[in-house]
Amino acid sequence: MLLSKKFLVRSLMVLFVLLGILAYGQIDYTISSTIINKHSIWAEFFNMFGEVPAMFGLLLGTTILYGLRNKKVMWKNILYSIIGLFFMLQSSFMICFMPIKYIFEFSKDGVPQGFKILSCVLAAIVFVSSVIIVNRISQEKLREFKKIAIVFILLVVLEILIVNILKVVWGRPRMRSIESIEQFKYWYQISGPAASNEFMSFPSGHTANGFVILAYSMFLPYFKKIKPNLFISFALTWGGLVALSRVVLGAHFLSDVLVGGYITILVFYTLNHIFIKDKNNEGFSGKKRRVV
């Protein structure tokens, strides 16, 4: 499924309006400080698992490209296998370790050794399963997913890169790090370079990673039983809850999550338009694609 230009323009207009409102007075600070609840169970759930769609998308993309490696030329097969397996293993580890890392985010001793071992074991299971599954899928079927794999990889890499560059440049203190309105910085105030992670509030990386779930809409032409609008509603709800959870936990202001989410939407739309969409609104496999 493709996000339409109309959707992009409308969402951009909403973003600008909201950022304009949040730039006035103490609205951004007031809203964020009002809903903060550092002990919220549901917010902690999305704090732990909100970024999984991005890491799993990275695993999905690298696994598909690994399955499409050139097996006829030995040196290419060996080289691409090493590169592919390395990134598959890394993605598998991130999927399993990130939720555990956030459990002990503020622990003085960090992640206990037992949990580190557990994450490695789980990562090994995910990694081996990925290798087995991709080797059972035909080359013809994998070729259908090649451009989707490229979009996933570029989307995750680009949104993480853009977000982290902005974080360092902006140097905005997190909600949990300030004690009064006097220490508050508006979203448009550039105070970088960031001295530490506590000054990397703008924009929200969690939210950007959470909205990567929208990219799974590219698989909808292959799963006819899933209603497109229902999936998009679910994806936007997931991204929205990830965003809200970051504000509730005091990790971000409302303006941080708005920009973080839109970065992913914009990058996804651009990549989707370049790699997937054609004049007839068909996918790269020739299957008709629906637009929302």
Regions found by a protein language model. Name each.
Residues 27-34, 94-106, 137-226, 232, ...:
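Membrane-interface loops
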Residues 57, 87-91, 125, 153-165, ...:
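Hydrophobic, lipid-facing residues on alpha-helical transmembrane segments of integral membrane proteins
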Residues 1-4, 75-79, 136-147, 282-292:
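Membrane-interfacial, low-structure loops and terminal tails that flank and connect transmembrane helices
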Residues 2-123, 170, 174-175, 180, ...:
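N-terminal transmembrane-helix/juxtamembrane module of multi-pass inner/ER membrane proteins
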Residues 2-15, 187-292:
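Membrane-embedded catalytic cores of phosphoryl/pyrophosphoryl-handling enzymes
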Residues 51-66, 119-133, 212-215, 261-277:
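Hydrophobic cores of alpha-helical transmembrane segments in multi-pass inner/ER membrane proteins
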Residues 75-93, 146-158, 235-238:
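Transmembrane alpha-helical segments of multi-pass membrane proteins
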Residues 42-57, 107-125, 194-222, 254, ...:
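Membrane-interface loop-to-helix entry segments
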